[in-house]
Amino acid sequence: MVMYEKTAEHFGQKFKDLPEGHLLVNLGPSHPATHGILQNVIQIDGERVVDTESVIGYVHRCFEKLGERYDYNQFLVCTDRMNYVSTPLNNIGWILTVEKMMQIQVPDRVTYVRMIISELSRIMDHIICNGIMGVDLGAFSGLLHLFHHRENIYQILEKLTGARLTTTFCRVGGMERDIYPEFQTEIKLILKGLKPALDEFEELLIRNKIFNERTKGIGGISADRAIAYGFSGPNLRAAGVPWDVRKDDPYMFYDKVNFDIPVGEDGSALDRTLVRMEEMRQSMKIIEQLIDGIPEGPYHADVPHSFLPPKDRVYHNMEELIYHFKIIMHGVKVPPGEYYHATEAANGELGFYVVSEGDKSPWRVHVRRPCFWYYQAFPEMVKGGLLADTIATMSSLNVIAGELDC
């Protein structure tokens, strides 16, 4: 892969002497409303892909450097804008990292709600991935078939956080606010409607002969190559590797719920789609085990040095006002050291490596974003295939530019 500012010189040297009959085709920069701004310069011989150069950096926003300037709660505005299709998963991953650094134990109520929102976000992400993949291959109706259910999940997030997309969900030590009274009832209604909708979507798209011919055996990758590239999440499991952070390195209460890990066979575009279909059903299974068991209790830990007190108490209590002032002006202080924590985001292992010197901001932040590794493998996965198959491969990898470039 190359950064965008070097492409002119780089491509001029690499593709200077093309064999007779070969052409250069730009796949992208694509419109931001699709998968984000991505570009691939593809050398073709007829309809066959000979070579590919992937370009990154079009939406690079210096998030890691911003992490060294913002305090630990403020960095949520950056995690919101990584994989913007399932923002709560990014937020929860960051907050869990900071709580691990500070050894904060949140109430069970907080953990239950975080897990439920995580799985709802995973469902949203997979709906978009599989739905948009159908659109990219010419089947538009499947996406619309599930959009109603995705909208219902957005309404849950809007009521819970005040925002649909950039939710800044959670705070260090808990949640910004408690769940609303109809939270559990509305989620049960969503699950009730989503189950038959997934079955219908599968019949409409996945079982479609044309879709199968466009995706079966296309853009495949072996288990060994996937591991070598650093794959994780649905794309690794589609290659036949049953690895999931929720199972293999459990966090929150994932070791206390029952769910299966779907795996594929050849890591093809079809396998990646089928794995995501089954993962949506497994996410619903997890939510069903949690939704009726949300315990009573506070929505934050008893950590006044890191969690803002409620506004009504700030206005009437001197101690609460002091805590409020200290947190806003001096931030959350984290013990010195190096920390890494990973969670299973919708695209795979999302990890945060943080170096702290005991200040209100990290000394260094690095984000292990799963899309970065998939995009590196893309040229190898499409080499020798048809130009039209590059679209199916890219869609099934679910490369989100906001997460890729950070």
Swiss-Prot record:
Its EC number is 7.1.1.-. Keywords: Cell inner membrane, Cell membrane, Membrane, NAD, Quinone, Translocase, Transport, Ubiquinone. GO terms for cellular component: plasma membrane. The keyword Membrane applies. The keyword Cell inner membrane applies. GO terms for molecular function: NAD binding; NADH:ubiquinone reductase (non-electrogenic) activity; quinone binding. InterPro entries: NADH_Q_OxRdtase_suD, NDH1_su_D/H, NiFe-Hase_large. It is an enzyme of class 7 (translocase). It comes from the Bacteria. It catalyses: a quinone + NADH + 5 H(+)(in) = a quinol + NAD(+) + 4 H(+)(out). It is found in: Cell inner membrane. Pfam families: Complex1_49kDa. It is a peripheral membrane protein. Belongs to the complex I 49 kDa subunit family. NDH-1 is composed of 14 different subunits. Subunits NuoB, C, D, E, F, and G constitute the peripheral sector of the complex. NDH-1 shuttles electrons from NADH, via FMN and iron-sulfur (Fe-S) centers, to quinones in the respiratory chain. The immediate electron acceptor for the enzyme in this species is believed to be ubiquinone. Couples the redox reaction to proton translocation (for every two electrons transferred, four hydrogen ions are translocated across the cytoplasmic membrane), and thus conserves the redox energy in a proton gradient. This is NADH-quinone oxidoreductase subunit D. The gene is nuoD.
